[in-house]
Amino acid sequence: MGVMLQAFYWDCPKIENREHQWWTYIKSKLPAIEQAGFTALWLPPANKAAGWKSMGYDPYDYYDLGEFDQKGGAPTWFGSKAELLDLIQSAHALGLQVYADLVFNHNSGGDAQELNPIDGQSRWTKFDPKSAKFTRDWKCFHPSQYETWDGATFGDMPDLCHRTPLVYTELINYARWLLEEIGFDGFRYDMVKGYGGWMVRSIQELRALRGSSSFKPYAVGECWDSERTIDDWLDEANAWSDNPVGAFDFPLRWRLRDLCDSYGFSLRDLTDRGVLMWDRSAQAVTFVENHDVVRDSPIINDKVLAYAFILTHEGYPCVFWQDYFNWDLAQPNNQRGIDALIKVHEQNAGGPTQVLYVNDDLYVMQRLGDGDHSGLIFVLNNRGTWNGTWIQTRWDNTRLVPAAWHGRDDSGVPEDKWTNESSWIDLWAPPRGYAVYVPA
């Protein structure tokens, strides 16, 4: 399915001294991103926000992508509309898809207060953006004439009422504009617990036009909750849909944090259900960090173990910008980091998953392969010494070679091994590390 890169982190323009230049900075990284094997970019919200220096999650003018002088200036914190268009076109030229971040639960930065006659409260619900598109007033927000509440609010920001016909149609039109005019290929839906899944389904059923052909947008939703809640949301959002949306696998992320940071974690727990990767792999977007969790609950130790897990297992893996570009986990030109794992994912990680062996300290998994992928063996070791076992694989009389590995203290390199005529082989992984073996 490919590998997604989250192409931002919180306050990245300020931290990297790229204020109003983030789009051009990403563009400068595109050759390296493409060469590494990434297939898609997830960009931060491109709309003009309530503040000039904002990450965009407080949307004011959806249609201002950095061209109207309002809320402090013309460009967004990431740059101008022209620079965004250039970034998208440059990414497409390299075969990369680009996903927009849609914040449809709430708005911010209203131009005037209004009295809502339904509850008698005054709120900042009058929006007259300079784009002159999707102007809003109290009738567009909760409580409205169509419903009083729809699931969740975000702070005290005005909460959009999607059952109001104007809001519903304007958001669909905006999504179509992003696909057809701006060039986005899909969406990440922010805070989907805040509004009905039917709204997402309505957008996903769009057939966007590009040139003389139509296409279905890719999408993933941020349902930050337990697997049961995510399941319920996926069922609602995808009911009768021929273009189902996926969801970020938050339950798996917490499990991977325990793997990396909790002393005594049993590798048996990796096989437990209750994560999308095992239960709904076709709709699972797996990740290790994102712009939210890294600020409050970061993974501190041995994070590459988590990346090895998501880049060898089923699901659509997403790599975090800081992990790749800032924190030295890419490790280009060797087999000990994310780059080698991306290559494994794209060349070998296909077909069903079989757990061949597991105990508290050793986990061995096999991907059976498919038409485009050869399959692999993933060995994860939680001991402080080399660890391995005999397993029966799908290959007989075949040489398996280590394609990616990592261990604490860089203690040695896994060896090439041959399966016997009965497909048995003994495979090992470095201390507190992993090894990925593929058929030669």
List the model feature ranges, each with a label:
Residues 1-154, 160, 193-221:
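Acidic/aromatic-lined carbohydrate-recognition and catalytic surfaces
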Residues 2, 25-32, 38, 45-47, ...:
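Active-site-proximal helices and loops of the catalytic beta/alpha 8
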Residues 19, 77-84, 164, 168, ...:
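Solvent-exposed, acidic/flexible segments
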